[in-house]
Swiss-Prot record:
HAMAP family: GTPase_EngB (MF_00321)
UniProt-listed InterPro entries: G_ENGB_dom, GTP-bd, GTP-bd_ribosome_bio_YsxC, P-loop_NTPase
Chain's gene name: engB
Residues where Mg(2+) binds: S46, T67
Xref: Pfam families: MMR_HSR1 (PF01926)
Gene3D superfamilies, per the entry: P-loop containing nucleotide triphosphate hydrolases
Alphabetical keyword list: Cell cycle, Cell division, GTP-binding, Magnesium, Metal-binding, Nucleotide-binding, Septation
Amino acids binding GTP: 39-46, 65-69, 83-86, 150-153, 183-185
Cell cycle listed as a keyword: yes
Protein name: Probable GTP-binding protein EngB
Length: 224
């Protein structure tokens, strides 16, 4: 069965949870496909989600670190987007930072339905230590990564492409496991490419086979 392109504009808020234990209380098991958005607290995750879904689905704030919870958005009954707590912001109290890091680690290590991770980084300051830790963890776990260089409108086209190429070179040892794209929530730079990658991640082979089986079963039932 050939499935049409995923419509990310249909995303709707599902739940917020302080940690993986509470997340499991609300979700119908560790099933389906989830795509996680992770990044430093000032990387622009909420703005990116709002642009990609064409709605104000995630709260934005001028105060980095506002997203303290795991926020889950439903695309359809099989697919979800997950906005993870921001990490690494210096002004966040240490105790709160440790709590966020624990929730982040629990989700990444225990969530079996994770199909891809978008790691957002300011294009002017990419590949900080925590960004690299996130990328390395995902690759080691056979989870594809999109390194998204945000705020690309802050650089001219030449400088932007130079930075993209530099980051691609630094991540080249990961081969095809990591893709790198420039992105701007303000100007819409890279939106089409990102949606294309997310669409692929939303359609793993096992889910396509399941949807085909469900379609055939529904046709049989309707013919009775």
């Amino acid at each position: 069965m050939s499935e049409s392109r995923i419509d990310f504009r249909k995303a709707e808020f599902l739940i917020s949870a302080p940690d993986i234990a509470h997340l499991n209380e609300y979700l119908p098991g560790d099933v389906g496909v989830e795509i996680a958005f992770a990044g430093r607290s000032n990387a622009g995750k909420s703005s990116a989600l709002n642009l990609l879904t064409e709605q104000k689905i995630a709260r934005t704030s001028k105060t980095p670190g506002r997203t303290q919870l795991i926020n889950v958005f439903k695309l359809d009954k099989h697919r979800r987007l997950v906005d993870l707590p921001g990490y690494g912001f210096a002004q966040v109290p240490l105790a709160l930072k440790k709590k966020w890091q624990q929730a982040l680690g629990e989700y990444l290590l225990k969530r079996e339905c994770l199909s891809g991770v978008v790691v957002l980084m300011d294009i002017r300051h990419p590949l900080k230590d925590l960004d690299m830790q996130m990328i390395e963890w995902a690759v080691e776990s056979d989870i594809p990564v999109l390194a998204l260089l945000t705020k690309a409108d802050k650089l001219g086209q030449s400088a932007r492409m130079k930075m993209v190429n530099e980051v691609r070179k630094k991540l080249s040892n990961f081969d095809d496991a990591v893709k790198v794209e420039a992105f701007s929530s303000l100007k819409g730079i890279g939106k089409g490419k990102v949606l294309g990658i997310l669409d692929q991640w939303c359609k793993p082979e096992w889910l396509q086979e399941q949807l085909t089986a469900e379609s055939i079963e529904a046709q049989i039932e309707s013919g009775k």
